Amino acid sequence: MTPRIAVMGAGAVGGYVGGHLSRLGHDVTLIDAWPEHVETVRAQGLNLYGMTEAERCTVHPPILHLTEVQGFVKQRPVDIAVISVKSYDTEWATLMMRQYLAPGGFVVSLQNCINEERIAGIVGWGRVVGCIAAAISVDLYEAGHIRRTVPKGGANHTVFRVGEVHGRVTERARMLADMVAGIDSVKVTTNLWGERWSKLCLNGMRNGVSAATGLPGNDIDRHDAIRRFSIR
């Protein structure tokens, strides 16, 4: 049976990944807190854009507002719960999804920062998998519309890094990697913590500068003086 996937947080990253998983034929339900976004996707679909016309598509995955998630109790349990919310929302988002997990289901942290320990505190270490989206640069710029503002990584850059907290390569890590391989390049890592810290260091260099200047990350990278400041 096809694994049932629920994406908690259908914003830029969660919506992009969940939308493309839906495009690839996976059983995906999106969940989000923004009512206008939810209603727009229901009525018009989720519009995904990239750097080329070939990357543009409209998908129609099921989508729920947070207040509607209790409807899962009447449906098949969730095999993969993807948490793609801000770090400070991790605990309640995981707690909300825990009761709908299948007995062998697991939770994937598709987030910045290092939240696997927070998730494990709710569902246990054995039900946690990490997935890093590196240099994906996506933006939910209006309800129902998500764009990617950098080229696909392909052979030049591995975008998705899937890993277990204990570092071993498992069947479920391979399965998750196979799923996202249809979106962009992926690897199963044996060093999830190293990957997490590398991403955190990069975010630490750029996010504060972005907040102070009002510039998105891509514009910071293109500005010689600001880029040098970030590196220093």
What are these regions (language model features)?
Residues 1-54:
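NAD(P)+-binding Rossmann beta1-loop-alpha1 motif at the extreme N-terminus of oxidoreductases
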Residues 30, 82, 109:
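Conserved SAM-binding loop
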Residues 46-66, 203:
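N-terminal glycine-rich dinucleotide-binding loop that anchors FAD/FMN and/or NAD(P) in oxidoreductases
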Residues 57-103:
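Rossmann-like NAD(P)-binding element
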Residues 76, 110-199, 204-205, 210:
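Rossmann-fold dinucleotide-binding core
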Residues 102-106, 126:
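A short helix->loop->beta-strand "cap" motif at the edges of active sites that frequently abuts
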Residues 222-232:
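Small-residue-rich helix-loop
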